[in-house]
């Protein structure tokens, strides 16, 4: 009896609605899997159309073209003699489902609809699909005529069903189902399913890989079995980067690990595993076997096909591997760089334009581009023909082969230091040195003539000329003068992005990169329509703390010594007059809180779902050794006041790489109003009452505290009622 099976899973860089490209990548993955001896190939969730189609799922065209690609795959010689598992949307009885279609030798074996839809964070699957709610039940799906003519089948099983081959049994999960409390793999495993597959569309978040790996290893540790996970990779047209991490596990151990970040459009993993190892592993777990006797059976579709070969005694089996994780700063170096590469090559632009201020944030964006150039050179050196073709198209030179990241960076990145009378020589020097060290084409200019022209128009109309606070002006004048400088820089950035290559006799235009980090966006510490307004922002979902660690990594890994000077310099916007030639404006002083505090506020607000009062209560304990209750209250109230005043800025935020679960992205991740009562009277009164009670307790005797404890408190609503005249 054959026992050893070779199975394949993959990570594909699919692109929403790119049916031709998606078809070719699926076909290539099947060819590679067959070439490695696999007899089962698993692909990512919705791989035929690309996961990120969003409201295009409502269009009949998306369903039609997906069926056409399925027909092309069924008819392709490469898909013969291997069980293929592909993801696509399907309409059954006028209901749209997110499905896996499993086929072999021009016959569709079954269609498995998704049963638990992802509907939190960036996911909106319930907007487009309906979950299959009939556990362990199937219906007959009537095939469209184009598939009937090809397969000679009229109907196929549709529902919660497993596949029985001659030698084993295979069950399917789809992405979110692995993450649910009652995952299907549990009962499937108890019912004798030995191979579980999971087609995923799982995007990158810093530190998320640990959770994904833990879920897979735990699934096979408690119940035994083989587990295959496929995932999409790359930017498929939105803010998300799908980070691969395809894997094959058995009995709690990993046997094949895919890359998390790479420029390869097609990556196929295979492993040869012994089914008897699954059976003996399960046999020793008596509690599992007792539960198995009580489980309701799954309907089975049988197929006259085996994953193993009859004479496999000399076939070597795969060995367990230790999963290699990236540190968060390495994830920042790789994830946004791969995302930028996909965005650039698919956007038909000729490179990037980045306003370089000499500070940490814009330096981090520059380092992401430089990291991208390093990845491109490495991919070309390793023989990736697709990357070579893409870079040749970008530079408009068919014979070009990139070898040096600095030289490539000079072709793809234009940086610009936009000085004003409030800029220091130190930031100018740091920006210039960084541009030299990464090799970007660098421009230095002065915005003062444009600022004076704008203010001249205002003065001509009103007869007034605003002044900075340092020169006796009001806070309104001071803020307006800062914003004029910031917005002029945005206008100039787009002008130079459109015409700088034209001025140098080169073709094309540039994408403008932004550099606002997630903490400053959360607080609104940016000017609306300044250089935070760009085409895309590679660091917009990353905290200042993580960015500093990333820049430190780049200083060491890429040998960029100027980054040490940038890290040690105080963070400043340089929008107010210098004091004796020195910077007088500091970011953390302007904000009234530190970046570390901002990160904590951000996680509590979004991840812990804390409003003002809940946040105050949590921070009382977290900060009890460094802050009094009154100080905690003031910090919380200051944060929520500024956050709510500036929330409107999030509605126009530049599309940014999603990296943190506390992102304030208003587009689809953090859906909240942008018109608040910024005084928060009820919430802040609750906080103030608690502060008063806590301060009173510290000054009371034990007897007074006991009396206070049994005293009837005054309801907060009474304190908010208008007082009698």
UniProtKB/Swiss-Prot annotation:
Q: Provide the binding site for ATP.
A: 355-362
Q: In which pathway does it act?
A: Cofactor biosynthesis; NAD(+) biosynthesis; NAD(+) from deamido-NAD(+) (L-Gln route): step 1/1
What keywords sit in the KW lines?
ATP-binding, Ligase, NAD, Nucleotide-binding
Q: List the Pfam families hit by this protein, alphabetically.
A: CN_hydrolase, NAD_synthase
Q: What EC class does the entry list?
A: ligase
Which GO terms label this protein's molecular function in UniProt?
ATP binding; glutaminase activity; NAD+ synthase (glutamine-hydrolyzing) activity
Question: What family does the entry list?
Answer: In the C-terminal section; belongs to the NAD synthetase family.
State the name under which the record lists this protein: Glutamine-dependent NAD(+) synthetase
| Record organism | Rattus norvegicus (Rat)
């Amino acid at each position: 009896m054959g026992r050893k099976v070779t199975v394949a899973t993959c990570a594909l860089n699919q692109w929403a609605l790119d049916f031709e490209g998606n078809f070719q990548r699926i076909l290539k993955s099947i060819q590679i899997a067959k070439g490695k001896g696999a007899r089962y190939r698993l692909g990512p969730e919705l791989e035929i159309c690309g996961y990120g189609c969003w409201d295009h799922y409502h269009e009949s065209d998306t369903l039609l073209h997906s069926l056409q690609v399925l027909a092309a795959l069924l008819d392709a010689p490469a898909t013969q003699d291997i069980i293929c598992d592909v993801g696509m949307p399907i309409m059954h009885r006028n209901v749209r489902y997110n499905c896996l279609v499993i086929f072999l030798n021009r016959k569709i074996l079954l269609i498995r609809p998704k049963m638990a839809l992802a509907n939190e964070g960036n996911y909106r699957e319930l907007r487009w699909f309906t979950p299959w709610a009939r556990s362990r039940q199937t219906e007959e799906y009537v095939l469209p005529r184009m598939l009937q003519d090809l397969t000679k089948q009229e109907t196929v099983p549709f529902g919660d069903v497993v596949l029985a081959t001659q030698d084993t049994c295979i069950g399917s999960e789809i992405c979110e189902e692995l993450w649910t409390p009652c995952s299907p793999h549990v009962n499937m495993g108890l019912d004798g399913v030995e191979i579980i597959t999971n087609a995923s569309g799982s995007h990158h978040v810093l530190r998320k890989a640990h959770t994904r790996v833990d879920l897979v290893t735990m699934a096979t540790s408690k119940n035994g079995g083989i587990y295959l996970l496929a995932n999409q990779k790359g930017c498929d047209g939105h803010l998300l980067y799908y980070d691969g991490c395809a894997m094959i596990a058995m009995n709690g151990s990993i046997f094949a690990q895919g890359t998390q970040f790479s420029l390869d459009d097609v990556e196929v993993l295979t492993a040869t595993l012994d089914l008897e190892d699954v059976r003996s592993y399960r046999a020793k777990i008596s509690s599992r076997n007792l539960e198995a006797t009580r489980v309701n059976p799954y309907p089975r579709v049988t197929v006259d096909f085996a994953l193993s070969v009859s004479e496999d005694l000399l076939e070597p089996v795969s060995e367990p591997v230790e999963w290699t994780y990236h540190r968060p700063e390495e994830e920042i170096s790789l994830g946004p760089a791969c995302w930028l590469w996909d965005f650039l090559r698919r956007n038909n632009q000729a490179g990037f334009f980045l306003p370089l201020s000499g500070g940490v944030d814009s330096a981090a964006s520059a380092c992401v581009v430089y990291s991208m150039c390093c990845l491109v050179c490495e991919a070309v050196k390793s023989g990736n023909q697709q990357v070579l073709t893409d870079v040749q198209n970008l530079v408009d030179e068919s014979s070009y082969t990139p070898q040096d990241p600095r030289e490539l960076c000079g072709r793809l990145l234009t940086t610009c230091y936009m000085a004003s009378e409030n800029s220091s020589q130190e930031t100018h020097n740091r920006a210039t040195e960084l541009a030299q060290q990464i090799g970007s084409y660098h421009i230095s200019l002065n915005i003062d003539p444009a600022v004076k022209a704008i203010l001249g128009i205002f003065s001509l109309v009103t007869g007034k000329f605003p002044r900075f606070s340092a020169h006796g002006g009001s806070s309104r004048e001071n803020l307006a003068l800062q914003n004029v400088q910031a917005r002029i820089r945005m206008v100039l950035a787009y002008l130079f992005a459109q015409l700088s290559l034209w001025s140098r006799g080169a073709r094309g235009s540039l994408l403008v990169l932004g550099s606002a980090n997630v903490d400053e966006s959360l607080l609104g510490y940016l000017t609306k329509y300044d250089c935070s307004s760009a085409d895309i922002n590679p660091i917009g979902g990353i905290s200042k703390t993580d960015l500093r660690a990333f820049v430190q990594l780049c200083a060491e890994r890429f040998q960029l010594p100027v980054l040490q000077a940038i890290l040690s310099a105080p963070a400043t916007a340089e929008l107010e007059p210098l004091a004796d030639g020195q910077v007088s404006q500091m970011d953390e002083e302007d904000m009234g809180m530190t970046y570390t505090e901002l990160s904590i506020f951000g996680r509590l607000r979004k991840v812990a779902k804390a409003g003002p009062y809940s946040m105050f209560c949590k921070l009382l304990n977290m900060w009890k050794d460094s802050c009094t209750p009154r100080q905690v209250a003031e910090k919380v109230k200051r944060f929520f006041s500024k956050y709510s005043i500036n929330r409107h800025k999030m509605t126009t935020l530049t599309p940014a790489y999603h990296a943190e679960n506390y992102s304030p992205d208003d587009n689809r991740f953090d859906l909240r109003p942008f018109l608040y009562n910024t005084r928060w009277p009820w919430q802040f009164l609750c906080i103030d009452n608690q502060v008063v009670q806590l301060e009173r307790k510290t000054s009371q005797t034990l007897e007074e505290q006991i009396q206070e404890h049994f005293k009837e408190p005054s309801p907060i609503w009474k304190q908010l009622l208008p007082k009698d005249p």
